[in-house]
């Protein structure tokens, strides 16, 4: 069953503070008190960061920041009252909640896909309600491609964010008719920073943002939709870590920033925290994980899961391990062999470990800190 979703117009200026989570908790109630009594703020929303490493933080965004981001996305993709969203992301994540902000400004309809994510149910509902636009994460795109599900004729744009989409998966989705537009953003930027205007193109920086990369390629971003800061709770005590509007946010992402005919473009290279040293060489885990996802498709391992992770190595500083779940030892060996054929010699994986499940976030990101603990 699906439900129509809409926020009352007064939500955006009623002075309330909204805590984004699936169910109320002791922590969120304490955060609401902290926001009211200590921060003394109104018309703010708090979202937990969806990153794969580090301490849990609540990102404080003004409702105006969310609307500013939504307006920029609507303009970039030409979203109007004629469009119909199918909401397949949780609204307690900024990627899902941002859809409600875009719909509020554009007047477009929103239908929420009920129940646990299911690729076939998603396609069926798209066809039933005449969906024209949707936002997905790479794992959902993988499921659509693995099941060889074609896009309904009504679909004109599928915004893919929450993680990098590898080129092979993008090409396979486009071949099935899915009008994929890769996007790049984070909770701290109220969702989008950059997005493809056309499938397969570089991601164009939205005009509300100023971006730069330092000598190490680490991205800094500044703009009017930037978060105010982080609420952090340690041992029951809340503190506030502000983000400077003047200097902006130095992210942990490595990018290439391109300037072409007065427009800025971003190419995502990987997470700064997702790089390890092996025999003195810097190795980015993100591209290796992308290769794993591509190989799973090619080897027909659609129902299985796998992830690369670093472990301490006395001689090499770090070494790589392939963690797998839902596959037998023969399939794991095939995957390991195929993966090693794509890697540099010092990156080669010599050990595979079977797990009950690969720890992933609600949006499908591999949780590296939790995975390391299991290994």
Which residues does each PLM region occupy?
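AMP-binding/adenylate-forming catalytic core of the ANL superfamily
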Residues: 246-347
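Gly/Ser/Thr-rich phosphate-binding loop
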Residues: 146-200
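AMP-binding/adenylate-forming
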Residues: 61-71, 84-143, 181
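Conserved ATP/PPi-binding loop(s) of AMP-dependent carboxylate-activating enzymes
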Residues: 215-251, 271, 281-283, 287
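Active-site loops of AMP-binding adenylate-forming
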Residues: 186-204, 224-228, 232-237
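Conserved AMP-binding A3 loop
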Residues: 44-71, 78
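Conserved pre-ATP/AMP-binding loop-to-beta segment of ANL
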Residues: 29-48, 81-84
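AMP-binding/adenylate-forming catalytic domain of the ANL superfamily
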Residues: 343-366
